[in-house]
Amino acid sequence: MLNAGGAATNGDDYTDCPDLSLLTTNHDIRRQLFTTVTGTSPATAEASWMAAQLFKEYPGIWPETVRALLIHSAKWTDRMQQRFNTDDKKTSGRKNLLRSCGYGIPSLEKAMWCKNNYVGMVVEDALQPFKKEGGTYKMNEMNLHEFPWPTETLESLGDTKVRLRITLSYYIEPGPGDIGWKDKYRYPSCSLRFDLINNNETIDDFKKRVNVKVRGENKKDSGEGSSGSERWYLGSANRDVGSIHSDFIDSSAVELCNAKFIAVYPVNGWWR
């Protein structure tokens, strides 16, 4: 969300108010040089300006990465939390917060630091999600990325609270109109998801959990350990919509020592 002015209300209706609007140049300078504007138009312009600054700072960066950096830098204000996240539960308050305010207000300064000297890792990568075997299409690749954790440093911090945030941004090709909209898998060409290894998993167990292809003959062998889904603030049911997914874990530093691997894998789309 970005500040684009406000409206005045009497409790029953709303109206534009110059004092709460943003100043801009007028389209007809013969009549007047300046005017006011409010709503989504100036908010869109500000978001575009922020994206342009990132492109300028880091030439060659992917558009998907620019979007990810802006979302990754966003934060909900206390007022947003108070109004929309009334019970702080994934199934209600946090869900309502995400639907009403998105991921919050982005910070251009923090977005730039994420590429510069903020503690973050940016990966620009690609995968082939599906392959054809005979007359059917099946899941193909997943990517596994390792965090360069300073394990000793995290261990030395002990119970100090830290936050790990992951943002996945990618391009989808919208479904052609002649395909129709029979179900939720028909609009995106392919969707992606991310998952983080849990403290009680080995790397082999983690691969088995997220990728059926590595399970061998026993396809029900999802490995030992658990997904640790309760660790996430939003949870997969809330974040896994659209083509950008962002979530975070608040944990002690020592508990994150072994959270070194993240998997990015495909799910259904109309390409398949």
Regions found by a protein language model. Name each.
Residues D13-L23, R67-S73, K182-C190:
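Active/binding-pocket-proximal capping segment
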Residues P59-F84:
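An often Trp-containing, charged/polar helix-loop segment at the C-terminal end
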Residues L157-R272:
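Long mid-to-C-terminal assembly/interaction modules of large eukaryotic proteins
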Residues K90-F194:
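Secreted peptidase-domain scaffold signal
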